[in-house]
């Protein structure tokens, strides 16, 4: 056999079927591997070579096959061509042996397990275990719920069976693939199986014609709603018949309490499946019809009037909900209602797992009779409207003077018994939607005070006064802050069998449970103008934030460019340019004009301190009035002025005087020029310009000293106010005056 040991991953990933090999390339192989599919001639040749040389030297065998490595030849023989390889069905003895070996070595060391099974390779053992022998694999018949999950997942994921298998614990990707290809595809495509959504699942309930609040409806109404994490509540129709119990749905799983890292991903995928499955019910849902419900206990009731009230309160603060109904609620009318019955034990006991919740129950537990006797409440009047359900939201406010207060926002408004015209005791538990709290900052109690003042009946005066006192005490507090936990957590915990403990209340906010408050008027839309509201100062302005800033804004491309520049080279700094750099710029310009470098650059030349504007202005003035021409080159080491003034144009004379004096100091004081030509020639002979490199012949070049020592001297030279410059300027004027007298066109010299 081969001398080189193979890793288990390589053994598992290499297939024994006749196809291209995706074997990782290894270092040290002298031949380039050919990844092309094995041909029949190569297989025949490999069989003959194995018969001749055996299976001990694969390098020798690979040398007879072009572009095939010894590793490829070995695997081709062991996985495909070996006549001892068993490709048929598994026997009971083999299955029992695999089970024993897995218990001994674990479900990952398949290469080692395959060595104990003659004729089987690691890949075969692995697939046999995961698809058939694993006790966690379900072998029962496929249920309709599993079919629906496969159908919905296949519409979105296609043939990604491994991803679909994550949605069905206990089912393998291979079994799901076989079930789809053999049974489900034909039934779905030809017989219309599962095409009508969830209708077949609910056929036994015979309530398809009844209106119901579906989970999809809750999803569209509330952004905090997570359908796959609501363990224990049910939807009921007005006549009390249960349409769907979420706790028994196959799509719902208990909240992930274990440490499975993929649990959250699975829940999101299940949520997508559930949303699509509920689409059919939402589209085929009939218009809501009035009904009646006479008796219930231990439940929270959803009232249509609450939905109407939320519409009226939230129309100025949010656009998240679509509000199609806008009605006026009468104080004397009562209408049949739709409600959401939430199992108290399932929800409230599960809330105990939230750290903030035990304190909120203290207030409820202080008056168990007032809070547990839900049957003492009647539903307020309202026309049928879509039920808007938002998650539970608890907020805590300071406790004052022993008044037990709490706010239990389940988006459910439980209104007290309506007072008759002659008056009477009643209880009110006004609850506020968290959406109102989310989009407006004033305290909840101030809103309740204004809402109750709209009432019209006589019995509302006492309730209005009581809540006004509470509002006056609460108005000085800051608006309700964001809670440190998601409101949806109250429905996201698994239900238990604990009973509601209401003996030690906690102090939260809003409804006064310890006092008897009379509310006999329904909640109506406020008629007070927006600018006259008491809490208008607390409301968040609707001004766009983009116009609040006064600083100029840099376009995004420039921001990105500056950020990249600072990231690469550090923060940008503004560095002032020294005068030495300006001198180099002037030298470069003059060098381009004259063709030669007429300045002497020394290592210790000082940095000039003249103003940048004066320097540039003087250079422009000289360049504008004079034309520069190239110097005659006599020797490579020096540049001398010509002695023959008749052959040189007047521009050369002026250029010499103006270019040499600003940067070079006069060698001696004998250079006072006279109007005669011999003085000019003597001055020209006195000066020589050294190039940047030292002149090898000191006799032919005169080394000039440093430049001016002070700013005043520098300015005098720059502006041409030295004695020599004035003399040269006067000579230039005389020369040009004679030139203009003989010429036909007049030329003016601007200095």
Swiss-Prot record:
Positions of the HTH myb-type domain: 30-81, 82-137, 138-188
CC per GO annotation: nucleus
Single biological process term from Gene Ontology: male meiosis I
Gene3D superfamilies (alphabetical): Homeodomain-like
Molecular function (Gene Ontology), one example: DNA-binding transcription factor activity, RNA polymerase II-specific
Alphabetically ordered keywords of this record: Acetylation, Activator, Differentiation, DNA-binding, Isopeptide bond, Nucleus, Repeat, Spermatogenesis, Transcription, Transcription regulation, Ubl conjugation
Residue numbers spanned by region Disordered: 1-22
Record-linked PANTHER family: MYB PROTEIN-RELATED, MYB-LIKE DOMAIN-CONTAINING PROTEIN-RELATED
Protein name: Myb-related protein A
Native organism: Mus musculus (Mouse)
Gene: Mybl1
